[in-house]
Amino acid sequence: MGTAAVPIVLTFLLVFFAWRMVFSMNGDLVRARAWGVLVRKALPFIVLTLMALSMLVVRNFQEQGVLTAWAVIFVAGILLANLLSTPAAERRATKAFRRGDYESAIAEYRTLAEERPLARYHAFLGAALGANGESEESIEASNRALEEDPQYGLAYYNRALVHRRENRRSRAAKDLQRAIDADLPRRFKNAARKLLEETE
């Protein structure tokens, strides 16, 4: 294998791991068979895959203009795909949640959960309700998420935080263990393990 093949191999490895990440971060969508939402979430990676495949053709062109146009088209494509990959209401809700405007986040997540009853939207609603101090409503939203997808670990994690805050240590410990055993991103699993040690 010559040195010219190294960038191509590295690019295809990047694409492979990017697709793995898409499916690991969106396992709930696969379990819910929400293929349209999954494709939408995968848009940046679809563009990245097209970019990698087109590299095989474009690298044969020596003209600088072709390479520049190719790069500009795909940078614009990735930016546009990234923008389109998340519904506007979800972006607004996430921004509101991060800045501590929980009322706005609750309203947006509630609308999302009503329009498309996915476990993630109910869990996000539960997190916003919990952050806003609405404990029972938060638990109800987390329960609804778990009805949609019993493997959605974030719902267990959110519910555990509410139980912990309400000093229901036994329930919190059970939900933290369930969160660890379920489909949960690594950073939340680590946080759940740490909280479980503190709770027991």
Task: Pin down the residues of each PLM region.
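Alpha-helical segment of the N-proximal tetratricopeptide repeat
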Residues: 79-131
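Short coil turns that delineate tetratricopeptide repeat
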Residues: 116-117, 150, 184
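TPR alpha-solenoid repeat register
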Residues: 121-122, 155, 188-189
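Register position in tetratricopeptide repeats
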Residues: 98, 131-132, 165, 195-198
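Canonical tetratricopeptide repeat
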Residues: 124, 158, 192-195
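Long, contiguous interaction/recruitment modules in multidomain scaffold/adaptor proteins
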Residues: 1-94
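Conserved structural position within tetratricopeptide repeats
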Residues: 111-114, 143-147, 178-181
